[in-house]
From Swiss-Prot:
Highest taxon of source: Eukaryota
Catalytic activity: L-seryl-[protein] + ATP = O-phospho-L-seryl-[protein] + ADP + H(+); L-threonyl-[protein] + ATP = O-phospho-L-threonyl-[protein] + ADP + H(+)
Quaternary context: Homodimer.
Protein task: Serine/threonine-protein kinase that plays a central role in centriole duplication. Able to trigger procentriole formation on the surface of the mother centriole cylinder, using mother centriole as a platform, leading to the recruitment of centriole biogenesis proteins such as sas-6. When overexpressed, it is able to induce centrosome amplification through the simultaneous generation of multiple procentrioles adjoining each parental centriole during S phase.
Protein name as catalogued: Serine/threonine-protein kinase PLK4
Gene Ontology terms: cellular component: centriole; cytoplasm; nucleus
Record domain Cryptic POLO box 1 (CPB1): where: 390-507
Gene: SAK
Sites where the protein binds ATP: L20, G21, K22, G23, G24, F25, A26, S27, V28, K43
Post-translational modification: Ubiquitinated by the SCF(Slimb) ubiquitin ligase complex; leading to its degradation by the proteasome during interphase and regulating centriole number and ensuring the block to centriole reduplication.
Region of interest (Disordered), residue spans: 371-390
Protein family according to the UniProt entry: Belongs to the protein kinase superfamily. Ser/Thr protein kinase family. CDC5/Polo subfamily.
Domain Protein kinase, first and last residues per copy: 14-268
Biased composition (Polar residues): 371-381
Amino acid sequence: MMSTRTFGETIEEYEVQHLLGKGGFASVYKARCLHSHQDVAIKMIDKKLIQGTGLTSRVRQEVEIHSRLKHPSVLQLYTFFQDVNYVYLVLELAHNGELQRYMKQHLLRPFTESEGATILRQVVAGLLYLHSHNIMHRDISLSNLLLSKEMHIKIADFGLATQLKRPDERHMTMCGTPNYISPEVVSRLSHGLPADVWSVGCMLYTLLVGRPPFETEGVESTLNKVVMSEFMMPSHLSFEAQDLIHKLLKKSPHERITLEQVLRHPFLKRTVGGSSYSTTPGALNEFSQSLASSDSGIVTFASSDSRKSHRLRSVDNSSGQSMPQIMEEYLPSSNLGYDSKEHRPVYEQHGSYLPTPGDQLENRDAKWPGTNNLAPFTSDSDMIPSPVGEKRLLMPPLETKRLQPTRYKTKNAIMSILRTGEVVLEFVKFKVKYNEDRITDICRISEDGRRIIIYQPDPGRGLPIREHPPDPLIPSENCVYNYENLPNKHWKKYVYAARFVGLVKSKTPKITFFSSLGKCQLMETMTDFEVRFYSGAKLLKSSTDGVKVFNSNGAVLSDNGCAEARNLIDHGNECFSHCVNISNALELAQTKENTCFPVTIGRRPAADMHAGQRFDGLRDTTNFAYSTPKSNQGSINFSVSTISTTRSASDYNSNTPRLNMLAAHQNVPIKRITVPEIGIVTELSHGVVQVQFYDGSMVSVIPKVQGGGITYTQANGLSTHFGNNDDLPFAVRDRINQMPQLQMKLKCAPLLGNARSVDCHLMTPKTTTPFYNRMII
């Protein structure tokens, strides 16, 4: 930085020229220093206005931060001073003005990818400098990127910037420009440096497309789109550009690409070539140099786009305290030491670090769980005191990572996990006026469990029940909460959702391991575990039911101390520890972009496999060994106080001779057709009709002679059996509605080549080992 003595310390030492921009609290003028004869921009901030509106701390904070900065990509603050009426900031003059105005009024087109990459590189270099000093800008937008006389990018407007005590510190302030603000900031969640990364993604999209990714006619609708992270990617952009934008605009801040990774991304490698910062204008040389402007600060420049670039200012939840007089805080810049704690902004003391979901999942105990994690949370012991004495939920935020989309209906609610990972609860009440159940309350929870939206759709009437949740809606900002400030009247809804997610996790395999004795599956809960032994025995471990051991005949071994049960339990303990160790190792190996789960380790020993099950690892994946599907998961019964699983009892008539013959023979396909846009329909020799849908799910219709009912297998392998009188979930009902049409097509299909031999076998029964319910892929 040039010495402050080069610049005047009073306004009389400057020749103030024409107005560059004007806002509610400040005006920016072009000026010339009478000492150095250098052109500068002077921001004149009205002290009466900022003191009357509580912005004194904002100005003090801006000066505290900006005065320490020196980087080619950051607009320089030369000096500052004050008189009775104004605070003056003497700034570097950016001759070519705002990048947004330049693109709209002079370039008259979006930037090319080469030009966009040059701009991106300079912005990222400047942000890396800021982040290295734990400074979060919080308002990166094209309006706050200025162009110097040499067409270099200058990051300006530090009115919303904040100094963090450490890189992982989080803040709760709602601020920024709507088109560039991140989802966690809109949702009033704790946020940190990744919020600037999101803004960089919006910036890059705007440079290459010509408009922001979430732009709408109104601020509220824009913020709704931001929260849902919904935007259209133009097809004309290169693969590298699309990939980088997608990585920058990840909804979860923990999944976003880092600024260091941006510099190594193929988009910059391809279009710029090299990773070092360069001050050469490069692709910007063709730009004309016809605008004059300066740091906008708190100024909002008047333009035709002012409606769309309206900024959200000062919605800080911690700004209720009285601020010291500004005169006491404006010290010479030489006294503003970077590490000087006494000169840090006052608001820092109110920042709070909130642990991420990953922090709360560390150090899991690799032992059998001994407590019920799904116990009701209804007493005072279910809450813990916060630092200010208010009570909070004891349970950690829910998380739906890797859970497949699903939808379940209970008496009072419909619960869904969407493809985005969002959890939706639709609470149902019977409306006499409509003579039907209607959706009266909706609770939407983000995949990390930290953003909650609760509202009443169409109050007084409700919505009719549909096959899928209602479209996302945020009626007002009062409907949006975060995990830390959720009112206690909504805690039961959150607990209800968390139990639903917990139950789905308890049925979703994370690690599948084939040991020497059986197939082991560690579920996403990291506590639920099962072993299906090749002998037919089974061991189940859950946080609700403890350990259950079944012998090869399916009977429960009530005495876990007997030799048979002890051997099975010992092997289960050994495999459980092994699976937990595998999980911990893979957790360290995976990256934000690439997950290692779910994973399958090993395969069933060939000596224990039925001859019909052996296969070459390179065989066609459609060459299955089929059997009559059976249920391995009961229908789900929820209540606010308890969650349990119940099995539908089906009466199997095992006395008929034909059923004995069927049980003695392998269940093989006799007909198979492929239906476009649906999947593969197969009829098995035992009479079962299976439909393998292209989304990975499967429906099996079982004939009455074998007990009847339907088995639905989700894409993740989770199977549920439904009796003839059971209430079917929407996903199953939708698929079952297609069955009559598919069965008609199947009737017209010719028999497969092995069908005749199957019929001959059925004429002459033989004693063979029953083929267990197993599918080899």
